[in-house]
From Swiss-Prot:
This is Homoserine kinase. GO terms for molecular function: ATP binding; homoserine kinase activity. It is found in: Cytoplasm. It comes from Nitratiruptor sp. (strain SB155-2). Transmembrane segments: none annotated. GO terms for biological process: threonine biosynthetic process. Catalyzes the ATP-dependent phosphorylation of L-homoserine to L-homoserine phosphate. InterPro entries: GHMP_kinase_C_dom, GHMP_kinase_C_sf, GHMP_kinase_N_dom, GHMP_knse_ATP-bd_CS, Homoserine_kinase, Ribosomal_Su5_D2-typ_SF, Ribsml_uS5_D2-typ_fold_subgr. Its main location: cytoplasm. SUPFAM superfamilies: GHMP Kinase, C-terminal domain, Ribosomal protein S5 domain 2-like. The gene is thrB. Pathway: Amino-acid biosynthesis; L-threonine biosynthesis; L-threonine from L-aspartate: step 4/5. It is an enzyme of class 2 (transferase).
Length: 293
């Protein structure tokens, strides 16, 4: 059984805990029944001993598999990780979604995507990452009475993502503690209006509108102060062809959306200026979770 889940970029500027999209950078898990339990990790996290001893995927997988079949069995797990850890690209959501999907698949029980999404909400209470991880594409998602309500829009191949990945991780939990408990009404209105406009821009494919619609006054500046060069990065990206330039999740990755014709030029400019950072040109992913026999 092979399970794969895409990377995600959430918040997208003003859409705090609400907006997210999927990127064509996947974590893959291969699972086989075995006489012995074993874990093999390739790619991101391969040298992290803690991931083998205290593995979130295994914990969630065993919890759901046991509920479905009434016992635990031994499996050989091979993880091929392409999503950087703790960089704001949804690595935790990918683990959660793939673990639940894998448990149901190995138990031989079909699970609708909507149900899987709501089970994932138990471990990740903010739907902006888990929703595109499951559904693919651009998603607007809210939680009401512990249930996710979401709408998806596929993203055309004429657009590309240029992501800039610093060599420094940022903890989402720690990042949240830096945010204020209260916000000015004018700033809240600013964000509500722009997140609404950004959603409309995606669904109507009015990409030029994103330059205005992706602005934020609630969280990005506070989070970016921990890595001040991100302010320069954002300004440079918007000058050199990005339609929007936003902190990806809580960071440290910066997400830039542009037309395909601008992607290589934008990536080169950013790589030349921020030589110590990884710069990747990525397609958008419209499939989300994939399960293969």
């Amino acid at each position: 059984m092979i399970i794969s889940v895409p990377a995600t970029s959430a918040n997208l500027g003003p859409g705090f805990d609400t907006l997210g999209l999927a990127l064509d950078l996947r974590n893959i898990v291969k699972i086989k029944k075995s006489r012995f339990f074993s874990i093999s990790i390739k790619g991101e996290g391969a040298n992290n001993v803690r991931l083998k001893g205290n593995n979130l995927f295994i914990s969630i997988f065993n919890e759901h598999y046991r509920k479905l079949v009434g016992k635990t069995d031994k499996f050989r797990f091979t993880f091929i990780n392409k999503i950087p850890l703790s960089r704001g690209l949804g690595s935790s959501s990918a683990v959660i979604v793939s673990a639940i999907a894998a448990a149901y698949a190995m138990a031989g029980v079909a699970i609708p995507r909507e149900k899987l999404l709501n089970l994932a909400l138990i471990y990740e209470p903010h739907p902006d990452n888990i929703t595109p991880a499951v559904m693919g594409g651009f998603n607007v998602a809210v939680v009401e009475n512990n249930k996710v309500y979401s709408l998806k829009k596929e993203i055309p191949q004429s657009l590309k993502a240029v992501v800039v990945i610093p060599n420094r991780p940022i903890s989402t939990a720690h990042s949240r503690t830096r945010l204020p408990k209260r916000f000015a009404m004018s700033d809240v209105v600013y964000n509500v209006s722009r997140s609404s406009l950004l959603t409309a821009a995606f669904f109507s494919e009015n990409w030029e509108m994103l330059r205005v619609a992706s602005m934020d006054k609630l969280h990005q500046d506070i989070r970016m102060r921990g890595l001040p060069e991100l302010f320069e990065l954002q300004k440079l990206a918007l000058q050199k062809g990005a339609l929007m330039s936003t902190l990806s999740g809580s960071g440290s990755t910066f997400f830039n959306l542009c037309y395909e014709s601008k992607a290589k030029e934008l990536a080169k400019v950013l790589k030349d200026r921020f030589a110590k950072y990884q710069v990747k040109i990525l397609d958008f992913d419209n499939k989300g979770l994939i399960i293969e026999e």
